[in-house]
Amino acid sequence: IEGTVKKSSEILLHEAALKARPDCNAAAHIHAPYLTAYAYCGKDIKLKCSTTFSLVFEEIPCLPYGLPGTIHIADGIEDAIKDHDLILLGNHGCIAVGKTLEDAVKIIEAAEEVLKIYHLTKEIGPVRNISDSDLEELYNNHPGSRRNRYGK
């Protein structure tokens, strides 16, 4: 990481994420409200009601709390981010990786938008999930789906 701008106290987090993902050139660490709320609760995000979420993410794992500004903020990041473009950081926020910084930020924005809609939906009534068989068909018919990108 080069340049004259002062490095973030969480530079170790960015370095660990990029080390694990040589296909990516940028990492974005943001405290987006909905994603951070899940991080505060220590909850993975698994939604079956949104085709967008299912195709792009399928799930967003949440790592345990790691002390910011120390190496512990990056505990578990290398394993988790190998198979995910977006990870929640327990009691903290989130980090996404992408080929460019714009790509990494767009990943966070997409997840945040889906979560806004999901929580509005819960206010209106029960959320109706997409069946597992329909989700399998969705994954199989979209070569760009997360499952097809990572082979899982």
Name the predicted role of every residue range.
Residues 1-152:
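Glycine-rich flexible loops
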